[in-house]
Amino acid sequence: MPEPAPRLILVDLDGTLVGANHEVSQRNSAALERATTAGARVVIATGRPVRLLEPVRASLGHSIALCYNGAIVFDLASDRVLEAHLLDGRVFQRAVEKVRESGLDFVVAVEGMPDVGLRGEEGFREGFEMPRGTLDEICDGGIVKGLIRAKGDGFAPIWEAFSTGFRGELEVTRSGIEGLLEISRAGISKGGVIDELARGWGIDPADAIAFGDMPNDLEMFRWAGRSVAMGNAEPEVKLAATEVGAHHDDDAVAQVLERWF
């Protein structure tokens, strides 16, 4: 018996729906449009800020977007923020200071609310224009996401320090940029936020399918009844998926959705 069509489609952007040319292919876009027309809900789940949806927005239809890994729930149809899950800047600051006491070397930036862009310490993305300040200055107020960039080859111990040292206090993950940690409020992940939304829509995890390629998609994979890792996904993501699909540059999302739509 063929699998029933999903009622909820969760799609990561970079390395999944978006190709290496930084665009959504016509085939992928058309598959999402057919799914929406057939009554399925489409949710874009990305680490991107809202402002960086703009280059691909025309291909996303009237979806809901989980930006900053779920910290911001954004309605593309009405162009407004539906939910904001902020991290207390001082909580983030104390975590950074504690890890730095161990001698680990890294630089920090934060994303403000809502979508006002990066502000960072000196040395974070040198050559990139952004407001600069001390750790105390950039952590003033609520933040959407904290960013930790390792210096040199020190990523692994920094990942270990934040991911294990603050379990239950911070949500720590990484996506496509080498040597970059993304930190949100505890409990805020693609999977955690979609669980709340799906309950409101009356959709069970068994009726959902998720597409992704990086560790920040793992919570979404654990939540959804079906999950598809891209052929280009990291090994741990492939292991967590119920299926491994094609490379993202080969319309991998459409290849799966065309079974039903």
Feature roles, as predicted:
Residues S29, E33, L218-E219, P235-K238:
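Alpha-helical segments flanking ligand/cofactor-binding loops in enzyme cores
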Residues A5-N21, F221:
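Asp-based phosphoryl-transfer active-site loop
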Residues W223, V228-F261:
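Asp-based, Mg2+/Mn2+-dependent phosphohydrolase catalytic module
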Residues N21-F124:
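Active-site phosphate-binding/coordination module
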Residues S59-G61, N69, A77, F166-G168, ...:
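Short, structured coil segments at secondary-structure junctions
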Residues G15, A35, T46, N69, ...:
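Residue-level signal for inorganic ion chemistry
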Residues K98, S102-W223, N232:
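Conserved acidic, metal-coordinating active-site core of Asp-based
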